[in-house]
């Protein structure tokens, strides 16, 4: 098995994947540190178990209840043996996850003495380990280096003891896979009394054995999540060294199943169970079905992979292969593409120092950092699942990126938040990309990921091939432009209403009338829905019927007999509207640039059922309140000049955008960035030529298909007045426009900037199906400053055309006269 390392699985890993992991079809999954994947036969085995046995609540004496109790006891023992833990020395407490186990320990330490406890933790700890510091009444300390830990251990016996001390650290960094000295636990125990260790093994146990056979060297508390090992069930464990169990003696709270007697009238008294640690700590009814599923997980895991040693060997081989390929990848000028964050002493061939996780960022040939969010988005389009951000490891990430606390506070003040796309600040990355391998990873995963990096981020020559020549004077004096189509999107992120030919449409400072005046909001979170998460929203098609005064909404495929229709009055009277707060920051895919917006939600059950039933999401329609626009257009800038040193010959080279003065900023309703979005038919045509001429990907069949202009969701599509042929067009010339006039009244529009694109352009607006184009091609041909651009943001000028606001209209066929940036 020379090309697969020393893996000794019972079957070839590719055979296992084909049989057990159909969910991996056409997908490259590289986020096993988040959760690994469950096997098909695990779910089937658990299902057979549930349908063949009657399991009752364990807190009863009935036969079904006793069966549950027996299974829980057996699986608890099996879990201890899985980690080579002697049940005479250790007990295992079932909890929701590793974080719940950490909190249980920290809460118990806080209650163990009147003054509380002292807490120390390693800088490379998971956020949940860091959070325990807030409960430490005596104080806390973050150890920035291993040397600091070593020095502290050596002086433990000389330090004054004010109360119990707890030192926590990860067995393996969830950020970069670096493994920590296991010997600290035993040394701390030997060096001082009343000092305990908490070891976070959640990341480690995903791909490595965790051996507790030597109780004297073991941590006092170990926390883990079983889904990291098996993918399912969602269950965690706290493994307690019994000699440290007295820490829980003064725990105040008790729940059902943890007491032998409780008095509630008169004297308030209770007697805790004393037979085992887990009986005292497992409050209420155990998640016994999840625990029973854990039994199926142990069986399946052993049958598929043999042992954790096998998994460790397999993933170590793959990680080394990936690391070698990433660190040797070069641009045309010899500069490294991948910057891997790895301690110098760790080695991907040594399981005592390194696990199968790679933390990295990408750089251009000139050394500029490439934004993590953009890489993750592009990977997602290619069905490659990776992780980006601070990876729930704030200290390790900050240390790797050399960010100080003052730096991060400044970033927070500038608007940076967890999960947003503030990728680069002060010229440095704010987060990290992570690839993590699992038991069922294979060489194809490595090849696919490296092929993705090479295709999109390795610069093979000093110049990027331009699709158009630089702007020349004669180009600005050739045939003119006209409005090819007008589109209004009454419900944000839903289908377009095409303004009929010959119909003049009113335009205001907020944009085309009725554009993005409504949105769909999640009834639980208040978050606005969007096509990135719910692509079927493209099949919700509004029609503005001015003659009847209604917004007629149709759901379903065109000409489908199952289509349903709902009519919403355009008039706000008698519309069952309730004012509510639309919090855009409650989830990552913020749809209104992070603004918190007050909207009026429709309270009618008929309205909410219409949209909820179609999307399969509990949602309702909401409307932007009248005369209350406090949102202002803020198109994203920073495109760089046409002489940018990073992309000197980029197609449609971007001129420097001029910032809009605060006094002239335009109000918007529920649009993302600006009142109006414009694209060019010639640019769409050129993009499609590029798409059709590019090679297909591994998972594609046949020639790539052109995309419709509708995927860009523009309000205005302009076309050139060709005398013929179409090849005479000027694609991307709109990038040179500073302003334009439209129609017989010469309505003046300012160009605010270029439109930054995301994966939503991959949703086919006719079928609601997501693909990889045009985002893949845009990423190669329309990137500037690590952002992808296509189309231009517009706003109607507030003065200078002599027309009153209410008389401004545009129509399909109107002449468009652009003004160009100066040289």
Swiss-Prot record:
Keywords: Molybdenum cofactor biosynthesis, Pyridoxal phosphate, Transferase. This is Molybdenum cofactor sulfurase. It holds the Pfam family MOSC. It comes from the Eukaryota. It catalyses: Mo-molybdopterin + L-cysteine + AH2 = thio-Mo-molybdopterin + L-alanine + A + H2O. Gene3D superfamilies: Type I PLP-dependent aspartate aminotransferase-like (Major domain). It is an enzyme of class 2 (transferase). Belongs to the class-V pyridoxal-phosphate-dependent aminotransferase family. MOCOS subfamily. SUPFAM superfamilies: MOSC N-terminal domain-like (SSF141673), PLP-dependent transferases (SSF53383). Pathway: Cofactor biosynthesis; molybdopterin biosynthesis. HAMAP family: MOCOS. Its EC number is 2.8.1.9. The active site is at 392. Residues 644-819 form the MOSC domain. Residues 628-667 are annotated as: Disordered. PROSITE patterns: MOSC. Sulfurates the molybdenum cofactor. Sulfation of molybdenum is essential for xanthine dehydrogenase (XDH) and aldehyde oxidase (ADO) enzymes in which molybdenum cofactor is liganded by 1 oxygen and 1 sulfur atom in active form. InterPro entries: Aminotrans_V_dom (IPR000192), MoCF_Sase_C (IPR005302), MoCo_sulfurase (IPR028886), MOCOS_middle (IPR005303), PyrdxlP-dep_Trfase (IPR015424), PyrdxlP-dep_Trfase_major (IPR015421).
């Amino acid at each position: 098995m020379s090309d697969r390392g020393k893996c000794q699985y019972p079957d070839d890993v590719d055979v296992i994947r084909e049989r057990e992991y159909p969910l991996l079809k056409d997908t490259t999954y590289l986020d096993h540190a988040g959760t690994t994947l469950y096997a098909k036969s695990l779910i089937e085995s658990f299902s057979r178990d549930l349908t063949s046995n009657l399991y009752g609540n364990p807190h009863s004496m009935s036969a079904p209840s006793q069966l549950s109790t027996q299974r829980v006891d057996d699986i608890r023992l099996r879990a201890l043996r899985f980690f080579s833990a002697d049940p005479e020395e250790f007990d295992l407490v079932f909890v929701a996850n590793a974080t719940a186990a950490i909190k249980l320990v920290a809460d118990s330490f806080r209650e163990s003495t009147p003054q509380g406890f002292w807490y120390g933790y390693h800088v490379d700890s998971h956020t949940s380990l860091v959070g325990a510091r807030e409960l430490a009444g005596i104080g806390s300390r973050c150890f920035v280096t291993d040397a600091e830990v070593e020095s502290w251990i050596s002086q433990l016996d000389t330090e004054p003891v004010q109360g119990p001390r707890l030192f926590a650290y990860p067995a393996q960094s969830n950020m970069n896979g670096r493994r920590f000295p296991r010997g600290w636990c035993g040394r701390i125990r030997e060096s001082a009394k009343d000092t305990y260790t908490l070891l976070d093994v959640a990341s480690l146990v995903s791909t490595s054995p965790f051996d507790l056979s030597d109780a004297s060297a073991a941590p006092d508390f170990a926390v883990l999540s079983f889904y990291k090992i098996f993918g399912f069930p969602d269950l965690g464990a706290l493994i307690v060294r019994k000699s440290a169990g007295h820490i829980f003696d003064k725990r105040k709270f008790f729940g059902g199943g943890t007491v032998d007697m409780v008095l509630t009238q008169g004297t308030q008294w209770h007697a805790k169970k004393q037979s085992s640690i887990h009986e005292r700590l497992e409050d209420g009814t155990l998640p016994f079905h999840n625990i029973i599923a854990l039994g199926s997980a142990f069986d399946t895991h052993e049958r598929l992979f043999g042992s954790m040693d096998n998994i460790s060997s397999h993933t170590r081989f793959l990680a080394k292969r990936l690391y070698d390929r990433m660190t040797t990848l070069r641009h045309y000028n010899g500069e490294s593409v991948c910057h891997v964050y790895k301690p110098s002493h760790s080695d991907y061939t040594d399981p005592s120092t390194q696990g199968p996780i790679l933390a990295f960022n990408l750089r251009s040939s000139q050394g500029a950092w490439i934004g993590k969010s953009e890489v993750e988005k592009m990977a997602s389009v290619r069905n490659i699942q990776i992780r980006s951000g601070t990876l729930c490891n704030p200290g390790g990430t900050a240390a790797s990126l050399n960010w100080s606390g003052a730096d991060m506070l400044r970033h927070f003040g500038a608007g940076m938040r967890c999960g947003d796309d503030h990728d680069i600040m002060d010229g440095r990355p704010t987060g990290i990309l992570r690839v993590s391998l699992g038991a069922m990873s294979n060489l194809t995963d490595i090849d696919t990921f490296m092929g993705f990096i090479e295709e999109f981020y390795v610069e093979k020559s000093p110049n990027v091939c331009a699709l158009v020549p630089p702007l020349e004077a004669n180009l600005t004096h050739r045939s003119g432009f006209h409005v090819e189509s007008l589109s209004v999107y009454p419900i944000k992120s839903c289908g377009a209403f095409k303004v009929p030919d010959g119909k003049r449409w009113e335009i205001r400072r907020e944009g085309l009338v009725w554009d993005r005046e409504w949105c769909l909001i999640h009834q639980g979170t208040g978050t606005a829905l969007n096509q990135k998460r719910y692509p079927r929203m493209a099949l919700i098609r509004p029609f503005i019927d001015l003659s009847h005064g209604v917004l007629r909404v149709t759901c379903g495929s065109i000409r489908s007999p199952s289509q349903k229709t709902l009519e919403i009055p355009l008039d706000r009277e008698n519309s069952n509207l309730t004012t509510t707060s639309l919090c855009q920051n409650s989830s990552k895919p913020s749809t209104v640039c992070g603004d918190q917006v007050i909207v009026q939600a429709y309270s009618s059950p008929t309205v909410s059922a219409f949209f909820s039933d179609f999307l399969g999401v509990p949602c309702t329609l909401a409307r932007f309140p009248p005369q209350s626009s406090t949102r202002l257009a803020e198109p994203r800038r920073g495109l760089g000049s046409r002489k940018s040193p990073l992309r000197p010959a980029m197609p449609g080279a971007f001129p420097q955008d001029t910032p809009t003065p605060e006094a002239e900023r335009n109000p918007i309703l529920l649009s993302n960035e600006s009142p109006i979005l414009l694209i060019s038919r010639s640019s769409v045509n050129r993009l499609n030529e590029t798409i059709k001429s590019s090679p297909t990907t591994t998972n594609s069949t046949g020639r790539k298909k052109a995309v419709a202009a509708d995927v860009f969701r523009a309000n205005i599509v302009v076309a050139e007045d060709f005398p013929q042929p179409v090849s005479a067009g000027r694609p991307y010339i709109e990038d040179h426009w500073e302003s334009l006039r439209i129609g017989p009244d010469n309505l003046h529009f300012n160009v605010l900037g270029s439109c930054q694109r995301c994966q939503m352009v991959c949703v086919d607006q006719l079928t609601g199906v997501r693909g990889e184009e045009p985002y893949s091609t845009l990423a190669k041909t329309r990137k500037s400053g690590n952002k992808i651009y296509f189309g231009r943001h517009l706003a109607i000028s507030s003065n200078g055309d002599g027309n009153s606001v209410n008389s401004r209209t545009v129509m399909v066929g109107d002449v468009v006269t652009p003004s160009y940036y100066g040289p």
